[in-house]
């Protein structure tokens, strides 16, 4: 069989030898040094690129991990600064209150997930925080009473409207005597 180049001849030989290696158990492919000498320049270049690409992946993973660590530390620092700025103010906007509630929920869930606390001081602080939260929750009951008063005021407005309709001060849309059917009696329908 005639080949146009040594590279195509080598490629055909390697495919045949790989085929025999898969079929025949004792067949060996040959020396790697002989293959290196018979390879064309493009094949040598592609082999070098394949070999160098493996460490590049590891380097990329390391750099990505470093970048991720830096970004995480930056976001933590920004959150800490934002919290300190909000904490220093006496009056908070609606967005700031939402942010603080979100922080409280997140921190409460993290504390709840802790299984055991070794340090006694931390445990005492945690119990103090729990007690203060319970006190704050107890104060919210007064707000609910105010809400009940508001709903009763709304109900009184509806009652006033009903009284005015009964007295005839306000008319309610519906059938008027001029629009009722001529032969219609209420006693007939019952």
UniProtKB/Swiss-Prot annotation:
Q: InterPro entries annotated for this entry?
A: Rrt14
- The superkingdom of the source organism is Eukaryota
What are the protein's UniProt keywords?
Answer: Nucleus, Transcription, Transcription regulation
Q: What is its main location?
A: nucleus
Q: Does the keyword Nucleus apply?
A: yes
Q: According to its record, what are the GO cellular component terms?
A: nucleolus
Localization terms from the record: Nucleus, Nucleolus
Q: Can you tell me which family this protein belongs to?
A: Belongs to the RRT14 family.
What is the role of the protein in this entry? Involved in ribosome biogenesis, probably through modulation of rDNA transcription.
**What protein does this entry describe?**
Regulator of rDNA transcription 14
Gene name per UniProt? RRT14
């Amino acid at each position: 069989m005639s080949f146009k180049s040594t590279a195509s001849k080598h490629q055909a030989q390697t495919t045949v030898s790989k085929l025999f290696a898969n079929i025949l158990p004792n067949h060996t492919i040959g020396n790697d040094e002989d293959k290196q000498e018979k390879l064309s320049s493009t094949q040598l270049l592609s082999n070098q690129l394949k070999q160098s690409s493996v460490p590049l992946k590891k380097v990329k993973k390391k750099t990505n991990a470093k970048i991720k660590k830096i970004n995480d530390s930056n976001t933590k620092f920004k959150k800490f600064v934002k919290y300190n700025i909000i904490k220093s103010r006496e009056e908070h906007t609606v967005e700031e209150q939402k942010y603080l509630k979100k922080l409280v929920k997140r921190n409460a869930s993290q504390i709840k997930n802790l299984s055991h606390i070794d340090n006694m001081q931390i445990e005492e602080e945690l119990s103090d925080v729990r007690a203060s939260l319970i006190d704050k929750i107890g104060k919210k009951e007064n707000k609910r009473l105010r809400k009940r008063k508001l709903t009763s005021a709304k109900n009184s407005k509806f009652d006033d409207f009903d009284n005015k309709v009964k007295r005839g001060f306000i008319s309610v849309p519906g059938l008027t005597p001029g629009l009722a059917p001529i032969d219609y009696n209420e006693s007939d329908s019952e």
